[in-house]
């Protein structure tokens, strides 16, 4: 199988934030599966234990973060180079009525076997920070 086309990756990239922000988990999953129905691997962020499988890499994080998180990808920070997509994500968390923005660099490498490897870069919030309750669950022993 070939890697996803540029048009497919552009559509997926638009849907990534739009469908997340709409709270439409079934459509968000279908968007993912349209470009990566195979194996998922994720280092989120790089330097933490690797996650594997769609549930660990996408579905469980959606359930944990979605209600408090709005995703923003400025168009000027989105790059598609062959089979890889990279962007600077603005993660807009609302915690106890307060807006907290955490920026991350996110890279997605789509392979011919329709697998994907995700690598992100950000400073993990400490467990005693306003975001600590999320990251203590997401990265136990790290946050």
Model regions and ranges:
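Short, low-complexity N-terminal intrinsically disordered segments enriched in polar/charged residues
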Residues: 1-35, 138-143
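A beta-strand edge to alpha-helix "cap/lid" segment located at domain peripheries
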Residues: 3, 8, 63-143
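A solvent-exposed, acidic/Ser-Thr-rich amphipathic alpha-helical stretch
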Residues: 6, 26-84
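N-terminal/domain-start segments enriched in small and hydrophobic, helix-friendly residues
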Residues: 9, 17, 42, 51, ...
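A short, structure-level motif marking secondary-structure boundaries and short turns
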Residues: 13-14, 46, 90
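Short histidine/acidic/glycine/proline-rich micro-motifs that form metal-
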Residues: 19, 46-48, 93
